[in-house]
Amino acid sequence: MNKILRGVIQFRNTIRKDLVKQFEEIKNNPSPTAVMFTCMDSRMLPTRFTQSQVGDMFVVRNAGNMIPDAPNYGAFSEVSVNTEPAALELAVKRGGIRHIVVCGHSDCKAINTLYGLHQCPKNFDVTSPMDHWVRRNGFASVKRLNERLHRGPSSMKFESEVAPSQSFDAIIDPMDTLAMEDKLSQINVLQQLINICSHEFLKEYLESGRLHIHGMWFDIYKGEDYLFSKDKKRFVVIDEKTVTDLLAELNARYPVPEDQDGPVAFAKSN
């Protein structure tokens, strides 16, 4: 708490004035362009590595950047009283955003826990909320990892029954350079995109092209951001050499609706 309180004092003496001014400027017309689901890991600073400013995007954080599959919440048609679907509704139906981003990262402690439980199920602690969280919501990702290990770096199909247009193919770690946990982390990001599609209240937005979902991955120790390219079927590092092609893919796949002006919101923010 000492560090937190002293940080508040530093904030008051440095950027507070400018930040309040920014709050005032967007007070009556906030216009976030995306909602990002990312991990609660203290090393993950999404507003820094995307250089987002006040009002640019919603950010939702939890252990392992997971958005549980709709059936995991309860009976069919049961209202989900949970953070993740509530955040999706707030951002999409009430906030009007057009882009959902799921951003995972390397050396993720939640994913490491999931992989550890997969390797040694007897270590599952029935009293641990964390163990229950990652096992329940990471099971599909573990199945995908097993598929990847069995088939090698070949294309895998990620399919959505609710929103078929959002299905895609992916090749995970084609050069086999990542640790097993990081392979699982990338798979987990893509599985969350399918999980998002499972929420019926988003179907009309997804199928009509009013809403788009994206997978990102951050390499903690290299400081490199990756975007999943549906054209290339893999995570592609975002740098000066690739950004033009990535933006071209985004604009081709997600054209701006006739009632909107300017470039794709997600592309514009990058």
UniProtKB/Swiss-Prot annotation:
The keyword Lyase applies. It catalyses: hydrogencarbonate + H(+) = CO2 + H2O. Zn(2+) binds at C39, D41, H105, C108. Binds 1 zinc ion per subunit. One of its GO terms (biological process) is IRE1-mediated unfolded protein response. Its cofactor is Zn(2+). It holds the Pfam family Pro_CA. InterPro entries: Beta_CA_cladeB, Carbonic_anhydrase, Carbonic_anhydrase_sf. Keywords: Lyase, Metal-binding, Zinc. Reversible hydration of carbon dioxide. This is Beta carbonic anhydrase 1. It comes from Caenorhabditis elegans.
